[in-house]
Design a protein with these regions (language model features):
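Structural alpha/beta core scaffold segments of enzyme domains
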Residues: 1-274
Length: 274
């Protein structure tokens, strides 16, 4: 096979150098990596789509064998940490706040996501607590003992119902539950073309739920060095710099104190960008 060099690499079909070890089962994914004396985290997740959180009770779960700690959203905020932001971060080359194309349409509503839900859950599976234990089995067993006291609210499950201006807001400040809005192209020319068309077909189309379903589940290994005050996270992802900036923003530390290592990644499809 001839070597492709220089500018010939741009747009060329390049040979993949990692495939041989993958087909031989020699890949190094996050779950293949282990650290001395590592602990295991297991998330307790909401079983309902929409509810106010009255209380997360962890007393009995904390007594389980090999459990080290159980954290809730209240513990996270008490330590002074912030949300995971889904907007432009200073120094981020991808600025979602910039106007779309040549119009002034807001591209994305500024929403903050907390690692552990605080006062409300907004979807089935949203994490409400994190059990940390010496083994994954011990963490999973203790998670079964965490009690969620929830005030169940009406969910929004239909896209047409959800997008109505008077619809129940799942995230406050998002009328019609619209978080991304964009109008592109030339409206006047489009209207003129439709007027001249022999046939115009109109309709509403409901797009089914789409999931970025990669083969490798989301996972990560977190380490902290007390001497250097450096946090290291090893996780398959689609951009170490974005991970670095988002984690630094949430932990309120200098990005230089966050080190992100990306091992082999078993698929992403966009979901591992955050």
């Amino acid at each position: 096979m001839s070597e492709v060099i220089g500018r010939q690499r741009i747009g060329a079909s390049l040979p993949r150098k990692e495939d041989l070890r993958f087909v031989k089962g020699s890949g190094q994914f996050t779950d293949d990596l282990n650290k001395p004396d590592q602990l295991y985290g297991y998330f307790v997740r909401s079983t309902v789509a929409h509810a106010n959180i009255r209380q997360i009770i962890t007393v009995e779960a904390s007594k389980s064998p090999k459990v080290v700690e159980i954290l809730t959203g209240a513990d996270y905020t008490a330590d002074g940490f912030g949300p995971i932001i889904h907007r432009a971060i200073e120094g981020d080359p991808i600025d979602y706040k910039k106007p779309a194309f040549d119009r002034n349409d807001p591209v994305a509503l500024e929403l903050n996501q907390w690692p552990l839900a605080l006062d409300k859950v907004r979807h089935v599976g949203e994490p409400v607590a994190l059990v940390i234990a010496e083994t994954v089995e011990a963490a999973a067993d203790a998670a079964e003992l965490v009690v969620q006291e929830l005030e169940v609210l009406k969910p929004v499950v239909d896209v047409f119902q959800a997008s109505d201006r008077d619809a129940l807001e799942i995230n406050e400040g998002a009328p019609g539950n619209i978080v991304v809005k964009h109008l592109g192209g030339n409206l006047k020319r489009t209207e003129e073309a439709l007027k001249k068309a022999d046939v115009v077909v109109c309709g509403k189309f409901n797009v089914p739920r789409v999931v970025s379903c990669q083969m490798e589940p989301r996972s990560g290994i977190g380490e902290y060095d007390y001497e250097s005050n450096v946090f290291t996270i090893t996780a398959g992802n689609q951009g170490v710099h974005r991970y670095q900036m988002m984690i630094a923003s949430a932990l309120k530390v200098n990005p230089g104190k966050i080190r992100v290592i990306c091992p082999d990644t078993g698929g992403g499809f966009g979901s591992r960008g955050h």
